[in-house]
Amino acid sequence: MALKSPAFRKKFPLLVTGSLLAMQPLASSFVVAAEQYDCAVSATGGWACSPKTPAAALPPRPVHDGSAVSAAGEAPAESGSTAESGPKPVLVTESKGRGLKSRSEDYSHLDWVPREKLTAAQLAETGPYCSGSYIEPIRPGMNDKTNKSDAPTFIGAKASRYQQDSQVASLAGDVVMRQGSMQVEADEANLYQAESRGELAGNVRIRDNGALIVGDHADVQLDTGEAKVDNAEYVMHKSRIRGNALYAKRAENAIIRLKDGTYTTCEPNSNAWQLKGNNITLNPATGFGTATNVTLRVKDIPVLYTPYIYFPIDDRRQSGFLPPTIGTGSDTGFMLVTPYYFNLAPNYDATLYPRYMAKRGLLMEGEFRYLTKSSEGQFGAAFLNDEETERSKQTDYQKNRYMYNWQHKGGLDSRVFTQVDYTKISDPYYFQDLQTDQIGVKSADFVNQQGSVTYRGDNYTARLNAQAYQLATVSNITPYDRLPQITFNGQLPYHPEGLNFDYETEVVRFDRDLQNGNFVNEDGTVERRLDNNVIGLARANGDRLNLKPSVSLPLNWTYGFLKPSLKYQYTQYQLDLDGTGKSQIVAQQNAAAATGTRYVGGEFGSSQNRGVPIASIDGGLYFDRNTTWFGKNYRQTLEPRLFYLYVPEKDQEDIPVFDTSEYTFNYASLFRDNRFSGSDRVGDENKLSLGIDNRWIEEDGFERQRISIGQALYFKDREVQLPGIDPKTRDDAHSNVSPYALEYEYRWNRDWRTTADYNWDPDSRSPRSGSAMLHYQPEDNPNKVVNVGYRYRNDQVRYDQNTGKWSVGGGDYGTPGQPGYVKDYYKIQQHDFSVIWPIVPQWSAISRWQYDYNRNRTLEAFGGFEYDNCCWKLRLINRYWVSYDEFSQNAPENEKGDHGVFLQIVLKGLGGLTGAKVESFLDKGIQGYRQREDQAF
């Protein structure tokens, strides 16, 4: 029957039953099934009733629990069919964390559906190693959002009776009571009008808002929805949470409280792990739970105790402790991190990371994150009073270690964009010693200290930037700061005859304070600072104005394109140089004259300028045809390309290098109009580059194969070089041809991909550089990951911090015959193999091996296994790696091998117990690992 609640509903919603049965003759103390009626509220506010179809004979009325007394003070009626005469129910405490099979062999009483019975949509939401899922059956009202005070009450049963003198209604046989989204089911029920209370017995189920409570007996407060269920089991379907309790209480606000209860995300037939506590509270409104006097049990064996725990029951944020991290390290000793999360508001939060290190003391780290309609960012800070004294003799060491950081991205309006990335650390050894990246600042050779404002106009972009760096190492020289940098770039809004007019403008101040004097190593040895190796013109600071207008005529057709272009780059410098640099220039000039060699260091002039025209013509054709390969249809393309570039030689030796380096040669280099990055060098060129692309494209647009090959023909030598490089002694500066540049990609299918690049020098008849990479990760099963790679490079153009000059080739570290010399230190010849592969269901092997052939050493190697099921995951990995600990300025001496065994345990639905370090090196070392984890269930 469906009834709209009358005004007296709050007192007793199920007075419907009493009103119905009270119309029967007073002499009859009960009404049998044959005398039942269906009633509804009439238009006049009364009851409109009609005879109900006869039902089966009414079973004996359930016995009223002796602990409960009706309003009339009536003692419970006696019955020959008592609970004692039947089999004793199995208690949840006897299940050892599993579901009660006595209620159903297949755990269907918990809405458990085996994997083979799930629909395709349900399987997509179920983990690959899960044997099933909790699926709430479709029922009337399950998604009803009506306020309960306004919702009608529905009652159903096979038979009912009403005792007028005690105001007790009895229902039997598939009893169902529903109001709004809440539904109560039982075999039998007694409803006590005076107390607005109901007693339910036999297969009790209470459903509401995606939660299910099952028990043997329940007391329900009919006007509020409060309930107490004895010998209870519960399920929260979406979160895959289940457990049991001596009894469970459901509050009016749907909060569930468990006495002597358990909590787990394991399947009903598993007790792999569970929380067991005296009092457990689950709050669906906040998405979090709490428990007191808690033991974490693994296979019913207690492994951890805590007097209190706060844990998530869904994906919502909430203040509380996060899973701790436990580990050891040679620099920290035993380490324990106990993060606490503050959910301050929907758009900002904070996290505190107390980090105890046995060797160093307590490091306090914290971060504050914010998000607004137009910006996002975070503040971070850390402090440690370091108890370790191993670096006490070392230059720049600070006992009070600290770091603070601000990262920000935002817009003042639709055109103005702001950005801040500022980090300050106490000393250059901070990241090496403390091994921390909790607050989003990654360890590097430098930390950035930058702020910028960008304005985007309709046809231009203006930017004001201030950028400095702080060294986070002692084995590099001090970099230049840009304080400030102003850029103004854009395109004129009109295009006469199809011409494009573009411009680039920059004004910037480059400045740095070189550290002179000596450096004291960890063992007390005194060395000269590396900044002393910066000599001559390289010590200059200065202002730079760079203007680069251009005009081009892009022509495009279906069969090809042509783009002639003319640029002019003008650069003006105002320089200052200290006395040391000036005297070094004179000394170098005298030394070159004495030996009869050419001086290539440049001369100092406070005002320098350079203007260089850049002319180019870029053109290409497009051919395609339909073809068949191995029975599959393709569109094959042939795309030849020609690029002519002319840049006259302009002497630039007297201009220092502030932000310029030389690009590494590859296929893309053939079509660049400057072989240098930055604005301090414009390379002289007279070349013609020829390239060709060949692609195989399937009918659905999938590119199966692509190959690109090209070479440049030079009509003059390249005289413009970086400081310290003599074009007369650089072989490739006077070659007539460039290396052959090759790029290749083949997709075996949508999962397997092979990429390669190769640069062959025809003059030396040897490779200059190359790499090959095979990557496999199925789209439908990202748990499988295979990476095989090899790379070789011996053509780097780099700055040598030990000599203060630029050099070409792989290069040695130091001087032959001197301490610390390492041959071919900068040459790269490495292989990298990594794999994550399921061996048997739930078990995967994890491995990586990175080897340096040039120095005959392993850079990193680890191997281990992962066990993953529906409710927990374990990784055990043995790892060797080359760590970097700066006790001197000699970089190779700071490299040392290290070894560790790492354990990671994740209890799904609760968090990781330990092993945050494992996540870090797997993410960095295995391509595809992050995609695998992001798509994991």
From Swiss-Prot:
Encoded by which gene?
lptD
GO biological process terms, semicolon-separated: Gram-negative-bacterium-type cell outer membrane assembly; lipopolysaccharide transport
What family does the entry list? Belongs to the LptD family.
Any one cellular component term from GO for this entry?
A: transporter complex
Q: Which HAMAP family match?
A: LPS_assembly_LptD
Residue ranges of region Disordered? 58-104
Give me the stretches of Low complexity compositional bias.
Answer: 66-86
Per the UniProt record, the lineage of the source organism begins with: Bacteria, Pseudomonadati, Pseudomonadota, Gammaproteobacteria, Pseudomonadales
| Annotated signal peptide | 1-33
Q: Is Membrane tagged as a keyword?
A: yes
Localization per record = Cell outer membrane
A Pfam family (short name) is LptD
Q: Which residues form a coiled coil?
A: none
* Keywords assigned: Cell outer membrane, Membrane, Signal
This chain's function reads:
Together with LptE, is involved in the assembly of lipopolysaccharide (LPS) at the surface of the outer membrane.
What is the protein name for this chain? LPS-assembly protein LptD
Q: Which InterPro entries match?
A: LipoPS_assembly_LptD (IPR020889), LptD (IPR050218), LptD_C (IPR007543), OstA-like_N (IPR005653)
So which domain of life are we looking at? Bacteria
Q: Which Gene3D superfamilies match?
A: Lipopolysaccharide (LPS) transport protein A like domain (2.60.450.10)
The subunit structure is: Component of the lipopolysaccharide transport and assembly complex. Interacts with LptE and LptA.
Would the keyword Signal turn up in this protein's UniProt record?
yes
